[in-house]
């Protein structure tokens, strides 16, 4: 089973080729739709395993939703009509760009962000949470910077540049001093080079304004990655 909530339409995923039996995803990440829709894709092997079960809770059973007698049964009730309109627009955008091009774009922009973060981390506390690039998400980058720098930086870029950075999830208990030492950069869905370079510029300005030790040339490193891919 694969959790693709934060990666669908961002990271390469080939369900059949990779032998995945069940995949779950949500609407609010790479599909660019507000939260509220969930998706379950399953293979024939998984369907056979379901049919062999003597008893299944209707809450978890996908059978009725996969083969409904009436349209509303896809959703277990009233259809989320406006979400479906949004999903239609999103899928049209994905089809127009092409999934291979979308995967390439996310790869390129992710590598630009990593280059910036690695440059900043040459001198100072900033480090990527995942050291191996092959294991990193192409949709979101989690960073460690030490408390209280994470919260201070998020606040500064929000107040002075209008950029919202994510909090660290699962890195420390909420309320603990260490909780303030992390942040995330989201780069999923309808994002492009000028959005990423603008966000990185805001972060670099925040590092300077707050006197957080960091290496120089983060934005330039990102620009080189983008330029090399053109």
Question: What do these predicted ranges mean?
Answer:
Residues 1-17:
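Catalytic PLP-binding core of fold-type I/II PLP enzymes
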Residues 1-4, 23-26, 33, 165-168:
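General beta-strand structural signal in soluble alpha/beta enzymes
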Residues 28-116, 230:
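Active-site C-terminal subdomain of aminotransferase-like
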Residues 97-105, 121-132, 168-169, 210-221:
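Flexible, glycine/charged-enriched surface loops at secondary-structure junctions
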Residues 126-198:
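Conserved C-terminal alpha-helix-loop-beta "cap" of PLP-dependent enzymes
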Residues 177-230:
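PLP-dependent enzyme catalytic core of the Aspartate aminotransferase-like
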């Amino acid at each position: 089973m694969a959790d693709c909530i934060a990666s669908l339409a961002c990271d390469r995923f080939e369900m059949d080729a990779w032998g995945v039996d069940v995949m779950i995803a949500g609407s609010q990440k790479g599909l660019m739709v507000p939260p509220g829709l969930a998706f379950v894709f399953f293979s024939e092997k998984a369907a056979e395993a379901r049919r062999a079960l003597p008893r299944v809770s209707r809450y978890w059973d996908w059978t009725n939703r996969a083969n409904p007698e009436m349209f509303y049964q896809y959703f277990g009730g009233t259809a989320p009509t406006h979400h479906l309109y949004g999903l239609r627009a999103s899928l049209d955008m994905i089809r127009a760009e092409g999934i291979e091009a979308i995967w390439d774009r996310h790869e390129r922009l992710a590598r630009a962000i990593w280059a910036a973060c690695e440059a900043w981390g040459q001198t100072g506390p900033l480090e990527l949470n995942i050291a191996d690039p092959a294991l990193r998400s192409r949709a979101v980058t989690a960073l460690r910077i030490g408390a209280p720098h994470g919260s201070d930086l998020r606040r500064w870029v929000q107040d002075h540049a209008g950029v919202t950075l994510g909090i660290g999830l699962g890195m420390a208990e909420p309320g603990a001093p260490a909780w303030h030492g992390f942040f995330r950069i989201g780069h999923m869905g309808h994002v492009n080079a000028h959005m990423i370079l603008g966000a990185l510029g805001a972060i670099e300005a925040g590092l300077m304004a707050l006197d957080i030790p960091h290496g120089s040339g983060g934005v330039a490193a990102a620009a080189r990655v983008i330029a090399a891919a053109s």
